[in-house]
Amino acid sequence: MGNDLDSALQIAGENRSELEKAINNVPKDQSKGMAWLISHMPDEDLKDISAEFLLSNCDLAHEARNNTSWGRELSDELFFTYVLPYANLNEKIESWRTDFYNKFYPMVKNARSSYEAVVMLNKKIFDELGVIYSTKRPKADQAPYESIAAGMASCTGLSILLIDVCRSVGIPARFVGTPLWHNNSGNHSWVEIWDGEWHFTGAAEPTDDKLNQSWFQELASKATEGSNTYGIFAATWEDTDNYFPMNWLPNVKIHNA
């Protein structure tokens, strides 16, 4: 990922007209965000994503930014990278913003900070949506509505769900994980949200009214920096020299970290 706009349009091939339609029809105050999104989305999305989807995604993300105190304080860099994207890794593309905003904005609209909002969301959304953790989930990399339909998800699917709910209400959020703990006891995924700095939490694992507390803290503290096996990675659509190692697709190296 990571192209200039002209290169992205070339990669789009026969879908170029859809991207140009999105660029030409986006409101002026959203044009920088649309250009960033098209320049940074996965190459495979450039080839089949619709203008209608892009315009809706961009508009709803900006609406959430404008309607929340924390959203209005965000830099463009944080907003573009951790609120505007419609996906985290390789999960199915879904239109979740309207549904999640309508469901969960009323829950957090009076929160004093994004920190406080995320604490509330992590306590309530999984019961509200009827999703639990289970190793019997259909697949690891479920998109939100796939997890809702199944009623269950892995830590990966739960994290994707919490991140997308956070983004729907203007909270910068990102997918974090390790391919393998230092003691070879397994992998794990979790969520980081921005409130002046990055804070972590386990999806569907609330710890009272606090972030930065979890059962996996000690394991995470022993991760090996720079190791593609024992390291910790945060997914991003920014240009980087690293990729996010996905256990469910071990040979795919297209998502940045």
Residue ranges of model-derived segments:
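Secondary-structure boundary elements
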Residues: 17-21, 27-150, 186, 240-241
